[in-house]
């Protein structure tokens, strides 16, 4: 019997459990990640992606970066958490593991969302431009899912292999791959 409280299947399907990454983030960032991470696994792809996009649209860049705790600050020799401007985050804060996990998801192209994971990695490294990349990736996926493409055609557009007939149908519609 599946344990939908402690270990929901839709969070265990990836290279690691989603909570391993989301617990490293403040509320807004953790929710955006959660909805993208699971969007194909719960059967409500567009709804989950719209929720992720809502969080991305309403958060400040610093709300989409990993949280650094007192323990992280002590590693730098500080007695209390440090307030560090975005531009300095790349150099000033210790890595709490989020950047590694984001790279794992990007390299695995988890859920076909490598550009989103890369954007979140850029944000975690202090680059505000990552927010634009993350938003574009989610918006693009929503428009693809709302289109009249077949599942095989979507797999091709995501970079996955699909039956040759799907490629022919896309080419007939004017899509070049």
Walk through the language-model features, giving the residues of each.
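Intrinsically disordered, low-complexity regulatory regions
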Residues: 1-177
